[in-house]
């Protein structure tokens, strides 16, 4: 019952915050909101620079593998648990899913930097 209550509160709070985040930006619509701030002067050029999609994919891949290391770091301490099979299976599934994702991105040539 306690876990159900915690999950219900978390889901409710998350839903409320997401709805507020989508609702609030629609209140203040004016043209100067999209312009960059340059000490009160009119902007000299566009502040919107094109963003490389290849860089974005490499950055996301780096972030995912960094997260994988953070999740697998406590694995040596988990060996002391009584149910080691469950922990090892979970770690194996995590590494397998990330390896499959890396193989897919590699086959789709998402990691090649040259265009």
Curated annotation (Swiss-Prot):
It is an enzyme of class 7 (translocase). GO terms for biological process: mitochondrial electron transport, NADH to ubiquinone. GO terms for molecular function: NADH dehydrogenase (ubiquinone) activity. It catalyses: a ubiquinone + NADH + 5 H(+)(in) = a ubiquinol + NAD(+) + 4 H(+)(out). The chain crosses the membrane at residues 4-24, 55-75, 87-107. It is a multi-pass membrane protein. Keywords: Electron transport, Membrane, Mitochondrion, Mitochondrion inner membrane, NAD, Respiratory chain, Translocase, Transmembrane, Transmembrane helix, Transport, Ubiquinone. One of its GO terms (cellular component) is NADH dehydrogenase complex. It is found in: Mitochondrion inner membrane. Its EC number is 7.1.1.2. Core subunit of the mitochondrial membrane respiratory chain NADH dehydrogenase (Complex I) which catalyzes electron transfer from NADH through the respiratory chain, using ubiquinone as an electron acceptor. Essential for the catalytic activity of complex I. Belongs to the complex I subunit 3 family. This is NADH-ubiquinone oxidoreductase chain 3. The gene is MT-ND3.
């Amino acid at each position: 019952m306690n876990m159900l209550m915690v999950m219900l509160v978390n889901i409710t709070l998350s839903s409320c915050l997401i709805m507020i985040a989508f609702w609030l930006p629609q209140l203040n619509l004016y043209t100067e909101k999209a312009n960059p701030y340059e000490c009160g002067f009119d902007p000299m050029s566009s502040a919107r620079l094109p963003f490389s999609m290849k860089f974005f994919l490499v950055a996301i891949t780096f972030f995912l593998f960094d997260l994988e290391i953070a999740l697998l770091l406590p694995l040596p301490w988990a060996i002391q648990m009584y149910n080691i099979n469950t922990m090892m299976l979970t770690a194996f599934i995590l590494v397998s899913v990330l390896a499959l994702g890396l193989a897919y991105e590699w086959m789709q040539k998402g990691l090649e930097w040259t265009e």
